[in-house]
Amino acid sequence: MSYECFKLTLSEGIAHIRFNRPEKANSMIPSFWTELPTVVNELSRDASARVIVLSAEGRHFSSGMDISVFTEGGLDGPASGSRFVRAEAFRHHCMALQDAFTCLEEARMPVLVAIQGAAVGGAMDLITACVCRYASRDAFFSVHETAIGMTADVGTYPRLVKLIPEGWARQMSY
């Protein structure tokens, strides 16, 4: 199967998922959020993979969520309807985004991630959901949501404070 955001190879029990949008710094477009859980869940059901390795093509691991996630049928939700309907659509969308990374935690095999360059915003959410993280010397990390007035609500903080001291997690956020 082919994917817009990923290249998938499977060899000798190793499933290698590579982010494949280097021209856009591997930003997470709307299809990313459906493709990732599809790939991971299929591999989790398939007995031929013993481990999943995530990596990225290009200079940066990922620049995080693409702005189109907010506009193209994304967080905008329905334009009409009551405030309750819009709020419920927003909540449903956020839960779907969270589920895209929860599948990494729930996979039957370990998920490892190799990081180079930038790992910003949503990329931080993703790497905190993996079992092991390996970073190149040029890797840098940023929870960028707070800089633009957003809450990092795709799972960053609950996962991050399990990995590093809470003070460091707070410092990364500002």
Predicted regions and their residues:
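Charged catalytic carboxylate motif
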Residues: 31, 35, 96, 103
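Crotonase-fold acyl-CoA enzyme core
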Residues: 102-174
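Conserved CoA-thioester-binding segment of acyl-CoA-metabolizing enzymes
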Residues: 1-57
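Histidine-centered beta-alpha loop that forms part of the nucleotide-sugar donor binding/catalytic region
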Residues: 20, 65, 116
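Glycine- (often His-adjacent) and acidic-residue-rich active-site loop
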Residues: 56-99, 149
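A short, glycine- and basic residue-enriched loop/turn
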Residues: 22-25, 59, 68, 138-140, ...
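Hydrophobic/aromatic residues within transmembrane alpha-helices
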Residues: 17, 54, 66, 126-128
